[in-house]
Curated annotation (Swiss-Prot):
Keywords: Acetylation, ATP-binding, Endoplasmic reticulum, Lipid droplet, Nucleotide-binding, Transferase, Ubl conjugation pathway. Pathway: Protein modification; protein ubiquitination. The gene is UBE2G2. It comes from Homo sapiens (Human). GO terms for biological process: cellular response to interferon-beta; ERAD pathway; negative regulation of retrograde protein transport, ER to cytosol; protein K48-linked ubiquitination; protein polyubiquitination; ubiquitin-dependent protein catabolic process. It catalyses: S-ubiquitinyl-[E1 ubiquitin-activating enzyme]-L-cysteine + [E2 ubiquitin-conjugating enzyme]-L-cysteine = [E1 ubiquitin-activating enzyme]-L-cysteine + S-ubiquitinyl-[E2 ubiquitin-conjugating enzyme]-L-cysteine. This is Ubiquitin-conjugating enzyme E2 G2. Its main location: endoplasmic reticulum. It holds the Pfam family UQ_con. InterPro entries: Ub_conjugating_enzyme, UBQ-conjugat_E2_core, UBQ-conjugating_AS, UBQ-conjugating_enzyme/RWD. One of its GO terms (cellular component) is lipid droplet. PANTHER family: UBIQUITIN-CONJUGATING ENZYME E2.
Length: 165
């Protein structure tokens, strides 16, 4: 199974290298281990995360693409769909099948036709448009709903930290 996963990851890396999506850089942490990737995601334009550069790690299971990877930001983040420890909570990273909570449709969840590029583009969209109904960070979700100005202020501080300012 790991051989299939490795071939798929190598093909996806080649595609990302030849045709990188705007504002995203991603690839294996080293050539010895294609199952751990690092990514840099630029904050989406015209959002409170604009100009930020946010590092993350993608950890792929040995049965990829049958199962989704896990993704975690390695910098400070304050966002409704990012746990305080950096783990990303987004439908595309949830295991295939029906949602036991009945919130997501199976079409929104992981399937083997998804790709690293689709994951990263989905995360960029998530940064731009948080889903406050599915709060991984309760404080950020509440602030996004009730005090948008304060949320933007914290996001701007995180952007500055991401740039070493």
């Amino acid at each position: 199974m790991a051989g299939t996963a490795l071939k798929r990851l190598m093909a996806e890396y080649k595609q990302l290298t030849l045709n990188p999506p705007e504002g995203i850089v991603a690839g294996p942490m080293n050539e010895e281990n294609f199952f751990e990737w690092e990514a840099l995601i630029m904050g989406p334009e015209d959002t409170c995360f604009e100009f930020g550069v946010f590092p993350a790690i993608l950890s792929f299971p040995l049965d990829y693409p049958l199962s989704p990877p896990k993704m975690r930001f390695t910098c400070e983040m304050f966002h409704p769909n990012i746990y305080p420890d950096g783990r990303v909570c987004i439908s595309i990273l949830h295991a295939p099948g029906d949602d036991p909570m009945g919130y997501e449709s199976s079409a929104e969840r992981w399937s083997p036709v998804q790709s690293v590029e689709k994951i990263l583009l989905s995360v960029v969209s998530m940064l731009a448009e948080p889903n406050d109904e599915s709060g991984a960070n309760v404080d950020a979700s509440k602030m996004w709903r009730d005090d948008r100005e304060q949320f933007y202020k914290i996001a701007k501080q995180i952007v500055q930290k991401s740039l070493g300012l």
